[in-house]
């Protein structure tokens, strides 16, 4: 062992050793319990950033800790490798997406290994590899056979910059979540997964996720958006057509004074044909259709009268039909009944267009609401009025009564509605999983047979965005034979949303080299579900919801034995610098490579883990990094000075009664074992765990420096030093490995059993208590531990120093707090 801490030499040495010895390869089956620790896999952009370092360092501590606790830990890593950035980079640099992606993977893999992460690299996956996306195509076919996959002509979100369709979940405030371009609306034939079939199960099973943050569950609950109400049918006057609306307030149906349709509602053209309002309505529709959803829902509410009426099925009233910008066709039924007296938006719209207002709910039977006095809609509960047979009913009871009446009369029904829409998976881009479908004039839409998978993604493609799939430009890909009749056919040229790839990768890790199955069910049964999942809260809806959906589908297909993929979820905070998220545009990016080169991977890990609790944002601090580096140097110097004593030390005696400084050293050691174990295994309070290790190191320095070498108990000293190294191992694996070897131990420190504390060693002989006079601390004194209140009071009051503090003052009251303080109230 060198006197100087040469982190570069040490980290290189042990990384090579771990790689050579396959230290982190885990067997699929053994007698040990299993633990599956997984961090969300990265997109191979080419460079790690500090957010990656934080995410993977957190996971690595958990994985190493669980391994030392006696678990077989599955801790894999892979690459979410398909997607638009590869195409955009390829266009910019004139390099094929595959070449760019694989080069980036090689570089980032090297960076991850430099961090000393305990991944089983034998399980590595890349979603762009044929042996991965072959099984993605196979899973598509399973959903297709189950009726959960379909194609339809749909109005979709279109990103003009990315030149592709976006799922609803990928549109944030009317903009593309990836490039921030304003999203447009477009009509296209698209493939969908029927996630709505699982809406209620996805909602119900949120209660099973006790290890998930509440905020994530609330976000999913709101996105699924369950609402109970009724579908009511209004007949169009003078027509066989009808309009169906969904409402959560059927108790207000007698207050309907107008009907509003979405501009893209298919009934609009029929309603206005030949009417005087036709030209005006067409102009309005064309103008609104150019707007984004955000513009439509956030701007002023605008509408236009169609000239048509429908009939309220409850009271026969004529209801004017309007078109409005704020009604979206893909939400609900694309039609909304206007009840201005009891809905604020409807109230404002009615005032703007001088539409009638009908009050049908009073606060109480004797509290009338006059329309001319209304300044806003009355939206609270009350008593139904002007509502025919329902007059006098409390409106909450009225909801059930109206639904029952509607069902009996055949004019409506009770229904549960969801905000969630089916998952749009088609993308008009090249770098993605080809959809395994062919189109035959004779046979129609035909799935590719499983034995013909994978449908290989061609490498020589002109992939510049044109609005059509680049694969259309490869005739040798497009033109094929029909699997059913053998006649000419054409392949589907859209590729799948990359979220399809990332919604099942956690299962592929369980048998990533399997060529016969997407995963070996026996292995999946052993490892699933993921015990600890770690990633950013930005994935709360998209990735996590889709993964939950896939797992439930796979359960129904008999492919897995679990219905939820992730038992526990940790959403780590961001890494900030100068109060802002690191970004090139702000010039505040800190390179992990530079930090590792200057201070070492162990220092980078220690700072990241010590600076803030995992779920909180972390403010980057150069001084904090230097402080972590100084601490590791301090540990190194301590062990270097004691290595010979530690290496030849006897074991702790079970019969020896340790007293004085030796007992205190043992107490510090076992307190650290207890505290670090609690912090790491509980809420992942790594910052306080590291702080406790620092306190233990201080205690060992004190023991070394204040106790002469001949008087030191080498068994106590060795216990303290060895414990420090083991406790440090999950956080700073390289230095811990080197120190373990230097103190005479065989084998890897990471294969050592985790420590258990000795409760007897935690018992203190003395405790320090504060003596207060009128609430102010005047003295701190050591007294025997575990004294009862009366004993402590008498012991302290008999001490000369306390008598001097009281002097000739009159004692009014004495308040003893055992083991902590004695407050003496005097006057």
UniProtKB/Swiss-Prot annotation:
List of residues binding ATP: 584
Residue numbers covered by motif 'HIGH' region: 42-52
Stored Pfam families: Anticodon_1 (PF08264), tRNA-synt_1 (PF00133), tRNA-synt_1_2 (PF13603), tRNA-synt_1g (PF09334)
Catalytic activity: tRNA(Leu) + L-leucine + ATP = L-leucyl-tRNA(Leu) + AMP + diphosphate
GO MF term list: aminoacyl-tRNA deacylase activity; ATP binding; leucine-tRNA ligase activity
Localisation per UniProt entry: Cytoplasm
Listed transmembrane segments: none
UniProt-listed GO biological process terms: leucyl-tRNA aminoacylation
Residue positions of motif 'KMSKS' region: 581-585
InterPro entries from the UniProt entry: aa-tRNA-synth_I_CS, aa-tRNA-synth_Ia, Leu-tRNA-ligase, Leu_tRNA-synth_edit, M/V/L/I-tRNA-synth_anticd-bd, Methionyl/Leucyl_tRNA_Synth, Rossmann-like_a/b/a_fold, tRNAsynth_Ia_anticodon-bd
EC number: 6.1.1.4
SUPFAM superfamilies membership: Anticodon-binding domain of a subclass of class I aminoacyl-tRNA synthetases (SSF47323), Nucleotidylyl transferase (SSF52374), ValRS/IleRS/LeuRS editing domain (SSF50677)
Cellular component, GO, one term: cytosol
Keywords, alphabetical: Aminoacyl-tRNA synthetase, ATP-binding, Cytoplasm, Ligase, Nucleotide-binding, Protein biosynthesis
Family according to the record: Belongs to the class-I aminoacyl-tRNA synthetase family.
Xref: PANTHER family: LEUCINE--TRNA LIGASE, MITOCHONDRIAL, LEUCYL-TRNA SYNTHETASE
Protein name: Leucine--tRNA ligase
Organism from which the protein derives: Desulforamulus reducens (strain ATCC BAA-1160 / DSM 100696 / MI-1) (Desulfotomaculum reducens)
UniProt lineage: Bacteria, Bacillati, Bacillota, Clostridia, Eubacteriales
């Amino acid at each position: 062992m060198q006197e100087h801490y040469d982190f570069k030499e040490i980290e290189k040495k042990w990384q090579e050793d771990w790689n050579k010895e396959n230290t982190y390869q885990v067997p699929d089956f053994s007698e040990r319990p299993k633990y599956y620790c997984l961090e969300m896999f990265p997109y191979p952009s080419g460079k790690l950033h500090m957010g990656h370092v934080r995410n993977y360092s957190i996971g690595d501590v958990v994985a190493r800790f669980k391994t030392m606790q006696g678990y077989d830990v599955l801790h894999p890593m892979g690459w979410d490798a398909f997607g638009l950035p590869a195409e955009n980079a390829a266009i910019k640099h004139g390099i094929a997406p595959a070449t760019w992606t694989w080069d980036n993977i090689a570089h980032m893999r090297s960076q991850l290994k430099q961090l000393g992460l305990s991944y089983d690299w034998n399980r590595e996956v890349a979603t762009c590899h044929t042996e991965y996306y072959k099984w993605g195509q196979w899973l598509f076919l399973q959903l297709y056979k189950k009726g959960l996959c379909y194609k339809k002509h749909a109005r979709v979100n279109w990103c003009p910059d990315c030149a592709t369709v976006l799922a609803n979940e990928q549109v944030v405030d009317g903009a593309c979540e990836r490039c921030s371009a304003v999203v447009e609306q477009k009509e296209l034939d698209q493939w969908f997964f029927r996630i709505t079939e699982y809406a209620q199960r996805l909602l119900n099973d949120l209660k099973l996720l006790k290890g998930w943050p509440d905020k994530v569950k609330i976000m999913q609950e709101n996105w699924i958006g369950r609402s109970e109400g009724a579908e009511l049918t209004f007949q169009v006057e003078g027509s066989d057509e009808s309009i169906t609306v969904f409402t959560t307030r059927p108790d207000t149906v007698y207050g309907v004074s107008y009907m509003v349709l979405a501009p893209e509602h298919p009934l609009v053209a029929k309603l206005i044909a030949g009417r005087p309002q036709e030209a005006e309505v067409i102009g309005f529709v064309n103008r609104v259709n150019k707007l984004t959803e955000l513009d439509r829902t956030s701007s002023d509410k605008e509408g236009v009268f169609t000239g048509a009426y429908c009939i309220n099925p409850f009271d026969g009233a004529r209801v004017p039909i309007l078109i409005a910008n704020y009604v979206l066709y893909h939400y609900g039924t694309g039609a909304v009944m206007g009840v201005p007296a009891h809905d604020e938006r409807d109230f404002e719209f009615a005032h703007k267009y001088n539409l009638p207002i009908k009050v049908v709910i009073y606060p109480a039977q004797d509290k009338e609401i006059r329309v001319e006095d209304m300044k806003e809609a009355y939206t609270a509960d009350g008593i139904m009025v002007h509502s025919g047979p329902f007059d006098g009913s409390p409106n909450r009871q009225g909801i059930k009564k109206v639904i029952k009446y509607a069902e009996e009369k055949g004019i409506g029904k009770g229904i549960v509605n969801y905000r969630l829409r089916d998952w749009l998976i088609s993308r008009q881009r090249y770098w993605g999983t080809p959809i395994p479908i062919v189109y035959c004039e004779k046979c129609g839409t035909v799935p590719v047979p499983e034995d013909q998978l994978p449908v290989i993604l061609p490498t020589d493609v002109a992939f510049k965005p044109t609005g059509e799939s680049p694969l259309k430009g490869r005739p040798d890909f497009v033109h094929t034979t029909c699997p059913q009749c053998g006649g000419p056919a054409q392949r589907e040229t859209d590729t799948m949303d990359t979220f399809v790839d990332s919604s099942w990768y956690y299962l592929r890790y369980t048998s990533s080299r399997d060529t016969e199955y997407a995963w070996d069910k026996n292995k999946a049964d052993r490892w699933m579900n993921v015990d600890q999942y770690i990633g950013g809260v930005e994935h709360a809806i998209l990735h996590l919801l889709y993964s939950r959906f896939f797992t439930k589908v796979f359960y129904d297909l008999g492919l897995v034995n679990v219905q939820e993929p992730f038992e526990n979820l940790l959403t780590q905070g961001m890494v900030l610098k100068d109060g802002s998220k690191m970004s090139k545009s702000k010039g505040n990016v800190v390179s992990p490579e530079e930090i590792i080169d200057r201070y070492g991977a162990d220092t980078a890990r220690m700072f990241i883990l010590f600076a803030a609790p995992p779920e909180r944002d972390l403010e980057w601090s150069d001084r904090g990094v230097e402080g972590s580096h100084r601490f590791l140097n301090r540990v190194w110097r301590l062990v270097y000075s004691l290595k010979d004593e530690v290496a030849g030390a006897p074991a702790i005696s079970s019969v020896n009664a340790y007293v004085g400084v030796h007992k205190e050293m043992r107490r510090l050691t076992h307190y650290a074992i207890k505290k670090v174990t609690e912090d790491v295994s509980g809420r992942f309070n790594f910052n306080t765990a590291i702080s406790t290790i620092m306190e233990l190191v201080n205690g060992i320095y004190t023991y070394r420096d204040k106790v002469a070498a001949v008087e030191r108990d080498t068994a106590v000293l060795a216990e303290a030093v060895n414990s420090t190294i083991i406790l440090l191992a999950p956080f700073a694996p390289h230095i811990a490995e080197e120190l373990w070897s230097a103190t005479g131990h065989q084998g890897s420190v990471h294969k050592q059993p985790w420590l258990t504390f000795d409760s007897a060693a935690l018992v203190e002989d003395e405790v320090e208590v504060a003596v207060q006079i009128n609430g102010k601390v005047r003295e701190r004194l050591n007294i025997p531990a575990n004294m009862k209140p009366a004993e402590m009071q008498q012991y302290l009051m008999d001490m000369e120093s306390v008598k001097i503090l009281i002097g000739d003052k009159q004692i009014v009251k004495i308040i003893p707090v055992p083991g902590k303080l004695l407050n003496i109230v005097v006057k």
